[in-house]
């Protein structure tokens, strides 16, 4: 439907509105829907019709349609009949027609202010009416008090204007146009209650929600960045020496920092690894010391170590009881805490017991030398022990030119030397076995015994 229009009166056309937008309001008497022509005394009034072929007389029919969309508060105004008009009503209608002309002249401006879309199904949206004025439409069973004795209009007129529930009387168009400034409000993003939101409102709501999400994400990213930079500044102010940290201090720090935000998780991880390694090493050491270990887990190792310590304490208590029960005159027992002299004597006695083996002091020294293949010899020597005997014996063999390749030497309960193979290094002369035996006896302190 074309939204552009112009009023035509008896004298001629009115000037163009909005820079030459052509009007399409033309009189077409052949397409009148109603068979009731206007009275002869009102021929000078303006007539108009829509492009769809619906002629209306503003003095009778348009007033009837527009009165149903206005909530009138004046109950004292007389009810106008569509076909019986007096002089007062004619004068009032002429004033209304002038206001209608001024309203339709500013139609394009109102449309631009309201941002009404061009594609709609409501006929009067082209005039800039809100959805609140045109939300309700006529129905077949609804009849307003203003349409009395004119049933043909309700059945043939299309649904242009709503029928308010509280319309009880007739009023002029001046309240409608005077309240028009109050109706012109900025377009809200959210739809009003009871009506579906338009496509523009949905898109505006989506843009607003997306912008709010972007603002929230930017603010959260800035907060994370600032917290990260603050942590870096805190950690960069001091030098951390990880190698100098011990396990006790790490445990103390972890206990004190409970419930607080950890700045360096790597430091705590390294400290925990060192603590566990030290604990495992000590458990292995304890397991090697304790003789009886039932299982290899930590609980078993600790339990067996505790049992072993209890056993040692019991043995110590038994020894104390035995010492207290024996008389002090007994010379067979040593004191509980021996002196260094007695301790060294006991060590020597344990190393060289006098009664376990016969002493070589009562025996003659023995030296045996046997020749083997080539220039190799086999030497067996046994004598009493004295300080420096091993060193003097090895020097004597070296002076004789013998290279000892395999030998066994024992200083337990005497001096015993078994040389399994010794070769002569000097090629010009050979050393005889008797000569080797005499040199070894002389070294042992038994010169002349051959």
From Swiss-Prot:
GO biological-process terms attached to the record: guard mother cell differentiation; regulation of DNA-templated transcription; response to freezing
Full protein name: Transcription factor SCREAM2
- Its main localization is nucleus
Cellular compartments per GO CC: nucleus
Q: Which residues form a coiled coil?
A: none
Q: What happens when the gene is disrupted?
A: The ice1-2 scrm2-1 double mutant lacks stomata so that the epidermis only contains pavement cells.
- Source organism superkingdom: Eukaryota
Summary of the tissues where the protein is detected: Expressed constitutively in roots, leaves, stems, and flowers. Broad expression within stomatal cell lineages of leaf epidermis, except in mature guard-cells.
- Compartments it resides in: Nucleus
Which ranges are annotated Basic and acidic residues under compositional bias?
221-230
């Amino acid at each position: 439907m074309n939204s552009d229009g112009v009023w035509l009166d008896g004298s001629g056309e009115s000037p163009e509105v909005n820079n030459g937008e052509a009007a399409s309001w033309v009189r077409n008497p052949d397409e009148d829907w109603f068979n009731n022509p206007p009275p002869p005394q009102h021929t000078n009034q303006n007539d108009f019709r829509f492009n769809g072929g619906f002629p209306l007389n503003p003095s009778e029919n348009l007033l009837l349609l527009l009165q149903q969309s206005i909530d009138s508060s004046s109950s004292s105004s007389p009810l106008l009949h569509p076909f019986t008009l007096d002089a007062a009503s004619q004068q009032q209608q002429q004033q209304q027609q002038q206001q209608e002309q001024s309203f339709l002249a500013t139609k394009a401006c109102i449309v631009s202010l309201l941002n009404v879309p061009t594609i709609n199904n409501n006929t009067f949206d082209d005039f800039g009416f809100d959805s609140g004025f045109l939300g309700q439409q006529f129905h077949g069973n609804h009849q307003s008090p203003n349409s009395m004795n004119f049933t043909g209009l309700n059945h043939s007129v299309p649904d242009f204007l709503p029928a308010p529930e509280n319309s009880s009387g007739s009023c002029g168009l001046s309240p409608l146009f005077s309240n028009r400034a109050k109706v012109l409000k900025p377009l809200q993003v959210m739809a009003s209650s009871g009506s579906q939101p338009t496509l523009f409102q949905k898109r505006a709501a989506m843009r607003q929600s997306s912008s709010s999400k972007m603002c929230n994400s930017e603010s959260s990213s800035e907060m994370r960045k600032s917290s990260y930079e603050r942590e870096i500044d805190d950690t960069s102010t001091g030098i951390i020496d990880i190698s100098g940290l011990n396990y006790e201090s790490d445990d103390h720090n972890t206990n004190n920092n409970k419930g607080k935000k950890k700045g360096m998780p790597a430091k705590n991880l390294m400290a925990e690894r060192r603590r566990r390694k030290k604990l495992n090493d000590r458990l292995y050491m304890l397991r090697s010391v304790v003789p009886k270990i039932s299982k290899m887990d930590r609980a078993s190792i600790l339990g067996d170590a505790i049992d072993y310590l209890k056993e040692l304490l019991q043995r110590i208590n038994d020894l104390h009881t035995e010492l207290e029960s024996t008389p002090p005159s007994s010379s067979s027992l040593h004191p509980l805490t021996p002196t260094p002299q007695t301790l060294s004597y006991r060590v020597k006695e344990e190393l060289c017991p006098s009664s376990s083996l016969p002493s070589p002091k009562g025996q003659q020294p023995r030296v045996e030398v046997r020749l083997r293949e080539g220039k190799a010899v086999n030497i067996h020597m046994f004598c009493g022990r004295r300080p420096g005997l091993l060193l003097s014996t090895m020097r004597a063999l070296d002076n004789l030119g013998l290279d000892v390749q395999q030998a066994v030497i024992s200083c337990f309960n005497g001096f015993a030397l078994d040389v399994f193979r010794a070769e002569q290094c000097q090629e010009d002369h050979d050393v005889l076995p008797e000569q080797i035996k005499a040199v070894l006896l002389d070294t042992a302190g038994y010169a002349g015994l051959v």
